[in-house]
Amino acid sequence: MISRRRFLEVSGVAAGVAVSHPLLASGAPEKPDDSSLPPSLAHLKSRQSEAAPITREERLQRQERARKLMSENALDAIVLMEGTSLRYFTGIHWWGGERMFALVLPAKGAAFYVCPAFEEGRAREQISGAPGGEQPDLRTWQEDESPYRRVAQGLKERGLTGGKLGIEETVRFVFADGIAKAAPQATLTSATPVTAGCRMIKSGHEIALMRLACQVTLAAYEAVYHALHEGMTQHDVGDLIAAAYRQLGFVGGASVQVGEYSALPHGSRTPQVIREGSIVMIDDGCDVEGYQSDITRTLVLGKASEEVRSKMNNVFDIVHRAQSASLAAARPGVECGAVDAAARKVITDAGYGPDYKYFTHRLGHGMGMDGHELPYFVRGNTTKLQPNMTFSDEPGIYIPGEFGIRLEDIMVITPGGAELMTGQAPSLEHPFE
């Protein structure tokens, strides 16, 4: 459920991990000393070799698909800046802050880049791996010059002065506004029909990377589960999860909530300590070649009182049935909103309604290179499911002041229905298969 950005906000664990365990120059996570790890973590083996990178040919196919969608949506070009859509179509990892770096991809003709002059070396290094990167059209601008005029000039040279430009949804307003003023005859609109139109439908390679990410996440969670003990804080657990990911060859983290704080879907900064019978909720995932996992497991350490245990198990069973119901409802042609409704009905019929009272959020979100991306399992969303769409499936029941239980796995739509990339959690006491 929790996005990578949101995780950094709500959990002090992530920030500490990022400082304590920097990446090596190769991009591989620094592996901890096995002797300092609990046995369940020390025995983990790296799975990094199983992750096959996305190729230039695949990115070229994506650009051709984008051009087709531009034609279908009457767009003359799309403008991409730093972020996952730029990486999706080119493989470029870019950060630039307030200085604009952009790719303009026309429906017809050659793409061009606009880049700060002092960043030209870094830009050419990355562009060389992108489709058409051998001889790119790269337009630079000095610190006292306008990058927007470079965009306008590139459009003019391609006969697109009065064209319709799709702006990717994460582009900052100041950049979009600058382009609009420099190219006043152009019409600016959303690029989402093109960018999401490509990204919502995953290739077999993308699904394989996501499936590996999910398997790695469950392996990390299970190893940490066997190392839990009374007296640990949520930060202790988070540190172990980060260490487990490094053992497995990847970088990841988790938001960890204990006891009554598990009733807050996105958690709390309040210091929390695991006690006998505590519910522990672990949520988030890892990155495998740019593709994300997002899994939640809720478990109990030791034995709660009979009364509390009975209530917890009853709630777990309801949430489990809700997840099963949404999985059964999902298939090509079904609207996203109907999948949310299937899970919500189970929870409401079991007495945890009405509506959003205890199941306080939508059922799920699209998954891929972003932890949260289009489309969404939410009431009113009429987007129809298609094969190879991927989503989180994460019903939950949250009882303020007591506990919350959420189960989250990644769902992929198949030609005949849907399946989870990992098996459902069997129970609170035995959360792993």
Protein language model features and the residues they cover:
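Active-site neighborhoods and metal-handling regions in enzymes and metal-associated proteins
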Residues: 2-433
